[in-house]
Amino acid sequence: MDFFPVFMRLKDRACLVVGGGPVALRKVSLLRKAHARVTVVSPALCPELAALKARDAIEHLPRGFEDADVDARVLVIAATDDEDLNRHVSELCTERCIPVNVVDQPELCGFITPSMIDRSPIQVAVSTGGSSPVLARLLRSRIESFIPAAYGRLAALVEGYRLKVKARIPDTELRRRFWERLLEGPVTELFMSGREDAARETLEKALETGLDTRDAGGEVFLVGAGPGDPDLLTFRALRLMQLADVVVYDNLVSPAIIELVRRDAEMIYAGKKRNLHTLPQEEINQLLVRLAKEGKRVLRLKGGDPFIFGRGGEEIDTLMQEGIPFQVVPGITAAAGCASFSGIPLTHRDYAQAVVFATGHLRDGSIDLNWKMLAQPRQTVVFYMGLLGLPIICRELMAHGVSPDMPMALVEQGTTQNQRVIVGTLASMPDLVKDYDVQPPTLIIVGEVVKLHERLKWFQPGTDHTVKSLFSSQGQVVEARSSTEGAEA
């Protein structure tokens, strides 16, 4: 270990920055975040530093560096493009035992400034010892994604209760366990979900009622898993997936996402395949209630977004009636994910000024929709769960005035490495789907925007599964074929 990691208190303490350019500005900004008293010595200042001087946020010595400038400084940073001057500042500070940093010259540094994650009062510093600042920034960005901004406010809450808890629990070991139980459970989760007042109430109650939070009731996390690609999960979704005691998941959640769930969590498959519901919806609702009443943290994991054809409303309605705490985490809905990964913008000023989401789910062999509304021009219609009802969808749209040549796309396993896009028309799509043995999950997009797929498609999976189609000058499909199978239709 070439550098010892340490955090310095610089509030109201005198620090010196040698240099007045953009590099010096970055260092001044860091010092000001720590509430240091900053003096800049430089014949000239960049506009941003000049603005700070104008409002007395920094002191400026408008001249060259002099040895006496380091007197009474607790920290010095050399940020000039004069290597001889930088070296002189370093040697001078070293002789006087003043911590010194020379930008981009680690061999001249008594200390280095790491790449930082600021969740004040929480701070995380990442350093490569000056060997690779770029790598340090990359590592910081990865770590940063796992530390929500609310952790800073949570730390401030804990700080506010430290003395009170210490007085109530004088034993060090018992006090540690108290904080562990709270921060690994209800207080943190309430805080992260924006219920900060409830978090304070829980903390107060824990202090008043025997200090034990193990009898706290469970909670349900209704989480949207997105369309399939794990990289499209939200930070909050991933955090709750790692926290859950039990997971109730559907068929539409991709295996790659299931792999990210906490390893020792109990897994309950709820099914939701067409006509094969392992658990009826009412039983799922009651299952969530029962598990939460057992004190478990229950992850209800759904493909896409739980409030878009996901029956999330039905589930939380039951939870509300039973008084079960819950939180809802939105996911990228299949329409947004599959369209984006297929190069099909759902709205476009030249083609569509509206987009409609509809369910293509069959009920008693038919699809009960407002077909007149869906047949309106200059809009895009997206059908969820429409594979089995595809012939009915095409027939009804044409019967209500939509041209048989209207472009149509079917996206299979969208956003994953197995994504396949079949492009045709209302007239041709039913036969194309038969030829390519399409399997769910699928999404259907109807509208002029589908014409843009061939030009805008950007996502190229490891194996090219795109079914290409060629449009005539009138927008009609004249040929469709799979690049993997060589079939034609």
UniProtKB/Swiss-Prot annotation:
GO biological processes: cobalamin biosynthetic process; methylation; siroheme biosynthetic process
Positions with a binding annotation for NAD(+): P22, V23, P43, A44
Alphabetical list of Pfam families matching this protein: CysG_dimeriser (PF10414), NAD_binding_7 (PF13241), Sirohm_synth_M (PF14824), TP_methylase (PF00590)
Gene Ontology molecular function terms on file: NAD binding; precorrin-2 dehydrogenase activity; sirohydrochlorin ferrochelatase activity; uroporphyrin-III C-methyltransferase activity
Signal peptide coordinates: none
Region (Uroporphyrinogen-III C-methyltransferase): 218-489
Annotated active site: D250 (proton acceptor), K272 (proton donor)
Location of region: Precorrin-2 dehydrogenase /sirohydrochlorin ferrochelatase: 1-203
Entry binding sites for S-adenosyl-L-methionine: P227, G303, G304, D305, I308, T333, A334, M385, G414
Pathway assignment: Cofactor biosynthesis; adenosylcobalamin biosynthesis; precorrin-2 from uroporphyrinogen III: step 1/1; Cofactor biosynthesis; adenosylcobalamin biosynthesis; sirohydrochlorin from precorrin-2: step 1/1; Porphyrin-containing compound metabolism; siroheme biosynthesis; precorrin-2 from uroporphyrinogen III: step 1/1; Porphyrin-containing compound metabolism; siroheme biosynthesis; siroheme from sirohydrochlorin: step 1/1
Entry keywords, A to Z: Cobalamin biosynthesis, Lyase, Methyltransferase, Multifunctional enzyme, NAD, Oxidoreductase, Porphyrin biosynthesis, S-adenosyl-L-methionine, Transferase
Cited function: Then it catalyzes the NAD-dependent ring dehydrogenation of precorrin-2 to yield sirohydrochlorin. Finally, it catalyzes the ferrochelation of sirohydrochlorin to yield siroheme.
Alphabetized NCBIfam families for the sequence: cobA_cysG_Cterm, cysG_Nterm, PRK06136.1, PRK10637.1
Family: In the N-terminal section; belongs to the precorrin-2 dehydrogenase / sirohydrochlorin ferrochelatase family.
Descriptive protein name: Siroheme synthase
Species the sequence originates in: Thioalkalivibrio sulfidiphilus (strain HL-EbGR7)
